UniProtKB/Swiss-Prot annotation:
It comes from Neisseria gonorrhoeae (strain ATCC 700825 / FA 1090). Residues 1-73 are annotated as: Domain I, interacts with DnaA modulators. ATP binds at residues 225, 227-229. This is Chromosomal replication initiator protein DnaA. The keyword Zinc does not apply. Domain I is involved in oligomerization and binding regulators, domain II is flexibile and of varying length in different bacteria, domain III forms the AAA+ region, while domain IV binds dsDNA. Belongs to the DnaA family.
């Protein structure tokens, strides 16, 4: 089978397999070619190729095997090839658009992967850049030069006029933030990026520049204290900076619930509906709290449809993946997955250090590298606790008139946290945690099996034991089924190397550290 024969059939299979929006945005525009006997799928840039490979390569390979197209697996690279039309299916009819009214039959929607970038509808060609284009540029960290003011320099104004202008600007800004409920401190400039939030931050900036298009809704989830509120409010602040006339509102889901119930009690339901429909961007934090409240969920269902149909941007946060919100209306779960769903991960060591340094800079305090490393190693779970720890150390610095935070000051200010963190951690506790995390038996960790799915967790457990306990290498060996200390040393070195080379293992290790210590 030639590429010209295979690709139109593959397009048909993928069209039937994927949600309509995903196919239209990611698959339909692809071009293909053949280089040195290898079939190639071309993306518009490296970022697009990486996303195609991670999300769709397996599906394309499955179709290739199904059609017995005896070629090696596709490779993905930036470039331009040949565009083929999708193979027709005789008598095929496109499915009708589902009704959006309550009780209507739902359109099946595929669950969104954590790092997938789907679109709810095919985006019509337009002169302006799409959110996908902007996101690709952001991920490549393209520099943006500040715009220079044009025209001749204005005449210097008097101090009184300047003060009046400043006061008026401040009053206008305060009024704007009172209307939007946004915090002026939550901006992209004050956001620290790391592995755990880099993709979400890039997506958020793209949405701020082109709201209501490809990624609607933007659904951000993760544990408490990871910076979800900062990131979503930064979208609102950035949009207002670019479009001061935009109507933006941030709120917690509790406020939405109370607002709806008040409208029901006061018989002002129509006013309530119009109030929320006016916004260009609506941000609701902790949307999971509307679960189990049937009337509230019903009303939000209609509000969601309005935002979707009018291409107004909706941003939601939650502590879990949409599909895992127990008690949430299935129709809402489905619609939450129409846009872009991303997870925020706990900050890695480098990001925690960067957060501390940025906080110190904002507070006008100097922090020594050793002190920043100490605090970052002490507080691993989330950004909120890390900032709280810094605030305590910063307060001690001011009260003691010490402009530089050193490790001794940090230890003194955080001594109660240190005492709590230094609870007795044993090899048995670590072995149990690792076994549960990797879903293997404790007997396997302690046993003689050397298969990869057993040996690697065993080495991770040994390395964690070395880091979190005071046991010697021979004692660690005894705790792991009587192994020789050289075996323990080899395992620890192997894990140290893998943490530098394998991002997935490094993330697993960091999560286990947090689980065991908390």
């Amino acid at each position: 089978m030639t590429l010209a024969e295979f690709w139109p059939l593959c397009l048909r299979r993928l069209h039937d397999m994927l949600p309509h929006g995903q196919f239209a945005q990611w698959i339909a525009p692809l071009t293909v070619g053949e280089e040195g006997g290898v079939w190639v799928v071309y993306g518009k840039n490296q970022f697009a190729c990486n996303m195609l490979k991670s999300q769709f390569a397996g599906k394309i390979e499955a179709v290739r095997e199904e059609l017995a197209a005896g070629r090696p697996a596709f490779v993905f690279k930036p470039g331009e090839g040949v565009r083929y039309e999708m193979a027709a299916v005789e008598g095929a009819v496109e499915p009708a658009e589902p009704s959006l009214h309550a009780g209507s039959e739902e359109m099946p929607v595929q669950e969104v992967l954590l790092d997938e970038l789907p679109s709810e509808k095919p985006v019509k060609p337009a002169a302006s850049k799409t959110a996908a284009d902007i996101l690709a540029e952001r991920m490549k960290n393209l520099p943006h030069e500040p715009r220079q003011a044009a025209g001749p320099a204005s005449r210097p104004e008097s101090a009184a006029v300047a003060k009046a202008r400043t006061d008026a600007q401040r009053d206008a800004e305060e009024a704007r933030y009172e209307q939007t409920n946004l915090s002026p401190d939550y901006t992209f400039d004050t956001l620290v990026e790391g592995k755990g939030n880099r993709l979400a931050a890039a997506a958020a900036q793209a949405i701020a520049e082109n709201p209501g298009q490809s990624y609607n809704p933007f659904f951000l989830y993760g544990s408490t204290g990871l910076g979800k509120t900062h990131l979503v409010q930064a979208v609102g602040n950035e949009l207002l900076k670019n479009r001061p006339d935009a109507k933006v509102r941030y709120m917690h889901s509790d406020d939405y619930i109370r607002s709806f119930m008040k409208a029901v009690r006061n018989n002002t339901y129509d006013v309530f509906k119009q109030q929320y429909k006016q916004y260009d961007l609506l941000i609701i934090d902790d949307i999971q709290f509307i679960k189990g409240k049937d009337r509230t969920m019903e009303e939000f269902f209609y509000l969601y449809n309005h935002f979707h149909n009018e291409k107004k941007q909706l941003i939601l946060t939650c502590d879990v993946l949409p599909a895992k919100i127990e008690g949430m209306d299935d129709r809402l779960k489905s619609r939450f997955s129409w846009g872009l769903t991303l997870e925020l991960e706990p900050p890695e060591l480098e990001m925690r250090i960067a957060i501390l340094q940025k906080k110190a800079e904002a507070a006008g305090i100097s922090i020594e590298d050793e002190a920043a490393l100490f605090i970052a190693n002490l507080i691993r779970s989330n950004v909120r606790e890390l900032e709280g720890a810094f605030n305590r150390v910063g307060a001690s610095s001011r009260f003691m008139n010490r402009p530089v935070i050193d490790i001794d000051l940090a230890r003194t200010a955080l001594q109660d946290i240190i005492a709590e963190k230094h609870k007795v951690i044993t090899a048995d506790i670590i072995i149990d945690a690792v076994a549960k995390y990797y879903r293997i038996k404790i007997s396997d960790v302690l046993g003689k099996k050397r298969t990869r799915n057993i040996a690697r967790p065993r080495q991770v457990a040994m390395s964690l034991t070395k880091e979190l306990t005071t046991l010697s290498l021979p004692s660690i060996g005894d705790s792991f089924g009587g192994r020789d200390h050289t075996t323990v040393m080899h395992g620890i070195r192997a894990v140290a190397k893998l943490r530098e080379e394998d991002p997935e293992l490094a993330q697993d290790y960091e999560k286990l550290l947090i689980l065991i210590q908390n």
